């Protein structure tokens, strides 16, 4: 399996408005597949914690054990600290760090979690090896990723299909490799996790599949934010689309979000491994 040099990926750029909208709906439910293996008193690390909306719920699950959330982005870590204070979560530590070089000694965690992280890395196996290093023998890891190449959208048209293709192009541009979300068990095994299991779910960027007018409006709005923001800028710079084509996609997304029969989901994949 191809695994480029760690750290060669381009950073995944997001719009602040998009981040606020999406992470407002990301909670501990995203780690439900790992929940049966968590116990009070465990020490847990959440890699790529973002603004902490999942991390604070994981901290509750392992209290009085410690939950540590790391993210490369200092701004995200600051937001996570604010959220933890607002919710009165005292057993969480949040800091800027790279999953490729975790600032922790070997065998220092009982559990690890990473959601929507591996898909943005040039070398997911290197990251998983580093997580395995800090897990105690028998420690558990849960990873989750969504497909960047497959979506289920109804109704559709060429402008919406072009938008979905743009997101796949962005992923490959950033990581230098094709999506491997179907290969989570293989990635875990290559990283040294001998026992693994995996499952599939349907998700949107903000939780379950969108099948009501309120939900499809939210999905359309979030997609348009990216289209008219950093992803649109990248698409023009790379020659993937013209500004006129981007606006046609945006208008198609808005119209789709208002359609009485609209539906949207994409495959999500989860996997668990034991060190």
Per-range role (PLM):
Residues 6, 45-47, 51-101:
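Class I SAM-dependent methyltransferase SAM/SAH-binding core
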Residues 16, 199-263:
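C-terminal helical/coil "lid" or tail adjacent to the Rossmann-like core of SAM-dependent
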Residues 142-221, 225:
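Conserved catalytic/acceptor-binding region of the Class I
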Residues 2-26:
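Class I SAM-dependent methyltransferase Rossmann-like catalytic core
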Residues 24-42, 57, 61:
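Conserved alpha-helix/loop element of class I SAM-dependent methyltransferases that forms part
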Residues 125-140:
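A short glycine-rich, Lys/Arg-flanked "PGG" loop and its adjoining helix->strand segment in the class I
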Residues 100-111:
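A short acidic, Gly/Pro-enriched loop at the edge of an enzyme's catalytic core
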Residues 110-124:
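A short SAM/SAH-binding and catalytic strip from SAM-dependent methyltransferases
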């Amino acid at each position: 399996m191809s695994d480029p040099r760690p750290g060669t990926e381009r950073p995944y750029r997001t719009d602040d408005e998009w981040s606020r909208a999406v992470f407002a709906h990301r909670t501990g439910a995203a780690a439900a597949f790992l929940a049966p293996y968590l116990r009070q008193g465990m020490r847990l690390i959440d890699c790529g914690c973002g603004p902490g909306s999942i991390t604070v719920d994981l901290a509750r699950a392992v209290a009085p054990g410690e939950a540590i959330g790391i993210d490369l982005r200092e701004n995200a870590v600051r937001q996570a600290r604010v959220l933890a204070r607002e919710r009165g979560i005292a057993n969480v530590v949040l800091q800027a760090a790279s999953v490729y070089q975790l600032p922790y000694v070997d065998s220092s965690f009982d559990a690890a979690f990473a959601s929507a992280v591996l898909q943005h890395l040039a070398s997911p196996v290197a990251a998983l090896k580093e997580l395995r290093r800090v897990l105690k023998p028998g420690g558990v890891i849960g990873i989750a990723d969504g497909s960047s190449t497959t979506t289920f959208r109804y109704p559709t048209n060429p402008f919406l299909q072009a938008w979905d293709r743009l997101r796949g192009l962005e992923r490959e541009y950033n990581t230098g490799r094709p999506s491997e979300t179907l290969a989570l068990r293989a990635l875990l095994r290559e990283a040294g996790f001998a026992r693994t299991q995996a499952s599939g779910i349907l998700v949107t960027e903000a939780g379950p599949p969108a099948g009501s007018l309120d939900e499809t409006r939210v999905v359309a709005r979030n997609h348009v934010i990216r289209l008219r923001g950093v992803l649109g800028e990248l698409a023009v710079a790379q020659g993937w689309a013209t500004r006129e084509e981007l606006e046609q996609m945006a208008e198609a997304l808005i119209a789709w979000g208002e359609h009485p029969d609209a539906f949207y989901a994409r495959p999500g994949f989860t996997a668990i491994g034991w060190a």
